[in-house]
Amino acid sequence: MFEINPVKNKIIDLSDRTSVLRGYLDFDAKVERLEEVNGELEQPDVWNDPDKAQALGKERVSLEQVVNTIKNLEQGLEDVDGLLELAIEAEDEDTFNEAVAELDELEQQLEKLEFRRMFSGEHDACDCYVDLQAGSGGTEAQDWTEMLLRMYLRWAESKGFKTELMEVSDGDVAGLKSATIKVSGEYAFGWLRTETGIHRLVRKSPFDSNNRRHTSFSAAFVYPEIDDDIDIEINPADLRIDVYRASGAGGQHVNKTESAVRITHMPSGIVVQCQNDRSQHKNKDQAMKQLKAKLYELELQKKNADKQAMEDNKSDIGWGSQIRSYVLDDSRIKDLRTGVENRNTQAVLDGDLDRFIEASLKAGL
């Protein structure tokens, strides 16, 4: 005879957790809003404003994910309960095993939805930019920056996010001095925001003829793409705008005409670059968007600086904090904030970052 009570208890537990999520995620309001959004998208003139239409489409996907998952969970738990009763009446082990398997599947769906509670930040739902900058270590650090770029592109691809290479600056011998990518998709900034910081690589350098161990650093800075409605005042007199010919490692995807744009914000020293379009005008518009987003994120960080400075156990804001150590000779990658380790270094460098990211989000970093 099969064990019934643990399965019944699990059904009750999952039902309770679904009910809690229903309230936390404001299910009824989302159902109502989904109807409104669908109504707006059915209007024949909706595409007269493409930006608004795209924003509505994005909102619909997000709403449908919550609404459909909760509906599926509630219906699925009801179905499993019925299946379990049938198994008990007929004393049918195959039906019982089917009920258990379906219950496990529902639990996975629920856990994914529960994880969304980690994305409670104001801009977590936004698309974002990831700036990578080679630190000390010369060619080794520049090669490391290119490895990080590949890692984040692979990770984004595995999550179904869209990526655009906004700017790339070649290293002196190999690798990259800097790169900026845009990551678009649901909760892109929420997923990546804890990746800001210094990434440290320790390995036997392929650029050292004596095969010595080298330590090099590369910095990542993640910031959200902000809504055009958010007003960021930028004085044109504070800007230095340079145009140049793109010469990055983007191959056919990077233009070779003198249409790349670099904007320097003199008061803050922030530099943004864009070279992913053949049009200088479009590159300038995109660079201004990046500048606004970066200034906004830095302003938010300044506001939080005083509060965080009081908490000694928390890392410094911005570029100064070392977050992860990649020791390739020892086959060990360790997050210095959460203690999470992964010895499959190649998998991590191929984009297997979820364990690190999920742990940092759960830790409230």
Swiss-Prot record:
UniProt PTM comment: Methylated by PrmC. Methylation increases the termination efficiency of RF2.
GO cellular component terms, semicolon-separated: cytoplasm
One Pfam family it belongs to: RF-1
Record key words, sorted: Cytoplasm, Methylation, Protein biosynthesis
Sequence positions bearing N5-methylglutamine: 252
Protein localization: Cytoplasm
GO biological process, one term: viral translational frameshifting
Domain of life: Bacteria
GO MF annotations in UniProt: translation release factor activity, codon specific
SUPFAM superfamilies: Release factor (SSF75620)
SMART domains: PCRF
Family annotation (PROSITE patterns): RF_PROK_I
PANTHER family reported in the protein's UniProt record: CLASS I PEPTIDE CHAIN RELEASE FACTOR, PEPTIDE CHAIN RELEASE FACTOR 2
General function of this protein: Peptide chain release factor 2 directs the termination of translation in response to the peptide chain termination codons UGA and UAA.
Miscellaneous notes: The gene for this protein contains a UGA in-frame termination codon after Leu-25; a naturally occurring frameshift enables complete translation of RF-2. This provides a mechanism for the protein to regulate its own production.
Family: Belongs to the prokaryotic/mitochondrial release factor family.
Protein's recorded name: Peptide chain release factor 2
Organism: Haemophilus influenzae (strain ATCC 51907 / DSM 11121 / KW20 / Rd)
